[in-house]
């Protein structure tokens, strides 16, 4: 799966309010640059960073107009100046 398809799937999740949870797990990591990573997440509030020795995770929060928020959690590692995304989790929560 390439970055363009992943962006489309994430956009679809935000548009389709009936979806409450979505996980994208990659057999082979999705390799992106720092700029592509920033483009993928947009400009949300980074609420949590977990620095495991091997796998990092960033948690972003997006506030919707209703009483819900969307959390985006990305599990990845960095190697040779690139970000290797292993999994992306999206889910909605009540505020």
UniProtKB/Swiss-Prot annotation:
Species whose genome carries this gene: Sulfolobus islandicus rod-shaped virus 1
InterPro entries: SIFV_Orf14 (IPR009804)
Protein name: Uncharacterized protein 95
UniProt superkingdom: Viruses
Pfam family, one: DUF1374
């Amino acid at each position: 799966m390439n970055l363009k398809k992943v962006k489309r799937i994430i956009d679809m999740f935000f548009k389709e309010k009936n979806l409450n949870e979505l996980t994208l797990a990659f057999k082979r990591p999705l390799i992106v640059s720092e700029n592509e990573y920033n483009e993928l997440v947009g400009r949300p509030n980074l609420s949590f960073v977990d620095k495991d020795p091997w796998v990092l995770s960033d948690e972003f929060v997006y506030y919707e107009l209703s009483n819900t928020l969307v959390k985006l959690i990305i599990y990845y590692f960095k190697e040779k100046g690139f970000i290797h995304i292993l999994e992306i989790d999206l889910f909605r929560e009540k505020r």
